[in-house]
UniProtKB/Swiss-Prot annotation:
One of its GO terms (molecular function) is oxidoreductase activity. It holds the Pfam family Pyr_redox_2. Could be required for the formation of a functional nitrogenase Fe protein. Probably accepts electrons from FixA/FixB and reduces a quinone. InterPro entries: ETF-QO/FixC_UQ-bd, FAD/NAD-bd_sf, FAD/NAD-binding_dom, FixC-like. One of its GO terms (biological process) is nitrogen fixation. The keyword Oxidoreductase applies. This is Protein FixC. It comes from the Bacteria. The gene is fixC. Its cofactor is FAD. Gene3D superfamilies: FAD/NAD(P)-binding domain. Belongs to the ETF-QO/FixC family. Keywords: FAD, Flavoprotein, Nitrogen fixation, Oxidoreductase.
């Protein structure tokens, strides 16, 4: 006879661990299945942890979580052959409790999963699986382990952007047109060297990059400082990589030679490389997130690319999915599609869907208007150089030169049209 659980959680990333932990704390019997060797071994992220999301799940997470540095400074670079940028630094973010941290995913995910196991979750890794569906209802999973079938009243799918189980079962579909591919490297440096280069103490700086760094494709680069390492990466739309005939590795190598980046990683020891698909379709690309005996959480349905958020959305969706099941079990209600619709209501009432809905037009606008990643970074960089250079030319003349260069690269009607498109995207 197949072993039975209240809930099976597929995946041991941010969403999967959040769901499993919340379920166990709610008194449910939980099995968590992970394909990788260990929790975190297949998980890749820019590695920023947002405290608000994890705090709702584990309030005292700061006591023992493997946190690298807390973030107090955000820099944005608009890149051409040189670079132009701005930064925001606030000492308010340097006062505990800190709001954002850099993390190493493999370390954090293992810690998070340990918390779930301590709460009562049974986690098994290196396990392949398929959904068990009977009469249109998900009733468990079939694994490649001895015993095969494992039954449950509900299954939460938190197995990533291209959720193999959801697609195979027909709950979702592959959407490569809405996927970005991010690649990153971890560069190790002595702590004192890093702190001197970035002018930081125990706190951290994050840098986001756009422009020539992405070869005119829809995407961004990023650099985050950890305790003794730098996370450096770039992500662009999968379709753009194909169209431009450039590999992610080539783009990352080009990024490392940029004069603004090369000095920051000089002398470092690159020990880790990873790649990851990221959903960038936004609100309009969200699939059905629940059905009879199943729910989807994490990267599979949701990510907020505009504000570079991911971990907080993943954890929140996992938590809300779990809370829905805990509440239904407490009310002695079945995990039917009609009852699991409460999960979608919780999502709609949360910041997750509200933010995604607000920016629902932006992915399509950016994808169809590449000038936001080519022409405008060049224009902004030229304008900054013109204004900053002291060469005996009066400011009024310089302003005329800037206006002329703008209209030279983009017509007046084009500028007005782009401004309207951008306004429509963020209104």
């Amino acid at each position: 006879m197949a072993e039975r659980f209240d809930v099976i959680v597929v995946g041991a990333g941010m969403a999967g661990n959040a769901a499993a932990y919340t379920l166990a704390k709610g008194g449910l019997k939980v099995l968590q299945i992970e394909r990788g060797e260990t929790p975190g071994s297949k998980n890749v992220q820019g590695a920023i942890l947002y405290a608000d999301a994890i705090e709702k799940i584990i309030p005292d997470f700061r006591d023992d979580a493997p946190l690298e540095r807390h973030l107090i400074e955000q820099r944005v670079w608009v890149m051409d052959d040189a670079s132009y940028g701005y930064h925001y630094r606030s000492e308010d973010f340097n006062k505990p409790p800190y709001n954002r941290y850099t993390i190493i995913r493999v370390h954090f995910d293992q810690w998070f999963n340990k918390k779930a196991r301590e709460a009562g979750v049974l986690t098994i890794c290196e396990t392949r699986h398929d959904l068990l569906i009977e009469g249109g209802k998900v009733v468990g999973v079939r694994t490649d382990r001895q015993g095969g079938e494992v039954r449950a009243d509900a299954v939460i799918l938190a197995d990533g952007v291209n959720s193999r189980l959801a697609v195979k079962a027909g709950f979702s579909r592959d959407q490569p047109e809405n996927w970005a591919l991010a690649v990153k490297e971890i560069h190790f440096l002595p702590q004192e060297t890093m702190e001197a280069r970035f002018n930081i103490g125990e706190e951290e700086a994050a840098i986001e990059m756009a422009g020539k760094i992405d070869a005119g494709m829809m995407g961004t680069g990023f650099l985050y400082t950890n305790k003794e390492s730098i996370t450096l990466g770039v992500g662009c739309m999968l379709s753009d990589f194909k169209q431009q005939k450039i590999s992610p590795y080539e783009l990352l190598d080009r990024m490392k030679t940029h004069p603004s980046i090369a000095p920051l990683i000089a002398g470092s020891d690159m020990k880790e490389y990873a790649a990851h698909l990221i959903p960038e379709g936004g609100y309009n690309a969200i699939p059905q997130v629940y059905g009879d005996g199943w729910m989807i959480a994490g990267d599979a349905p949701i990510r907020h690319g505009i504000h570079r958020e991911g971990s907080n959305l993943a954890m929140t969706t996992g938590m809300l999915a779990a809370q829905t099941l805990v509440e239904l079990r407490a009310a002695d209600k079945p995990f039917s599609a009609a009852n699991l619709a409460e999960y979608k209501k919780k999502l709609d009432d949360s910041f997750v869907m509200k933010d995604l809905k607000k920016y629902r037009r932006m992915p399509e606008i950016f994808h169809k208007n590449k000038q936001f990643f080519t022409t405008y970074p060049d224009l902004l960089s030229r304008a900054a150089q013109t204004l900053i250079r002291v060469d005996g030319v009066d400011k009024k003349t310089k302003e005329k030169e800037i206006k002329k260069s703008f209209i030279g690269l983009r017509s007046l009607f084009g500028l007005i049209g782009d401004a309207f498109k951008f306004w429509r995207a963020v209104e």
